[in-house]
């Protein structure tokens, strides 16, 4: 549409295109990688420990990439919970990100991942983790559940996962939102 309006070829204007038509190399990882870099800097600045437990609400593209990149880029960390549109799972001893991605691709869901137990969707957001990645739904963290968020860092990979009212509560509770 932009090219139609301007009447010129401009491949750099929009993302998520194949490389052959001007897409960006690294696009697949871009959202998650940017989030992880921001988490790394927040941890360095405020003394948080990225090698502790983390959870991902929304195990789609961004959530999967964050799970895979977290350990690689932050020197460790234990994924203890993940959710998708069909349900949520947890294992306090950790979920292997690579195996979970494979399982999701094979079955279409995180549910029934070996060694995990099913938990309510909303519980993923309220677990006692160092870092929480809301990577699925707008308004997932809202006035009703913000007081229950125990993460020290919330790294928003979804579009608008935290409502303005919830953001005020998180700020008051010293939860850092990226």
Region spans (language model):
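N-terminal ligand-binding/catalytic initiation module
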Residues: 1-25, 38
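Conserved acidic residues
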Residues: 80, 130, 152
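Flexible, charged surface loops at secondary-structure boundaries
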Residues: 124-128, 147-149
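Short, glycine-/Ser/Thr-/acidic-enriched flexible segments
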Residues: 3, 43, 61-62, 86-87, ...
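Structural motif
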Residues: 55, 131-133, 155
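A short, structure-level motif marking secondary-structure boundaries and short turns
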Residues: 23-24, 52, 150-153
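Rossmann-fold NAD(P)-binding glycine/threonine-rich loop
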Residues: 136-178
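Glycine-rich phosphate/diphosphate-binding loop of Rossmann-like nucleotide-binding domains
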Residues: 26-126
């Amino acid at each position: 549409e932009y090219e139609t309006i301007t009447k010129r070829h401009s491949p750099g204007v929009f993302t998520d295109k194949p490389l052959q038509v001007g897409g960006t190399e690294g696009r697949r990882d871009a959202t998650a990688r940017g989030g992880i870099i921001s988490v790394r800097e927040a941890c360095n600045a405020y003394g948080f420990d990225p090698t502790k437990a983390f959870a991902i609400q929304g195990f789609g593209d961004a959530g999967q990439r964050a799970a895979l990149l977290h350990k690689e880029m932050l020197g460790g960390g234990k994924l203890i919970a993940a959710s998708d549109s069909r349900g949520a799972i947890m294992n306090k001893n950790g979920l292997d990100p690579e195996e979970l991605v494979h399982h999701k691709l094979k079955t279409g869901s995180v549910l029934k991942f070996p060694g995990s137990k099913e938990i309510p969707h909303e519980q993923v957001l309220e677990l006692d983790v160092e870092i929480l990645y809301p990577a699925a739904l707008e308004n997932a963290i809202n006035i009703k559940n913000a007081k229950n968020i125990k993460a020290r860092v919330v790294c928003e990979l979804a579009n608008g996962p935290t409502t303005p009212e919830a953001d005020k509560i998180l700020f008051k509770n010293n939860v850092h939102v990226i």
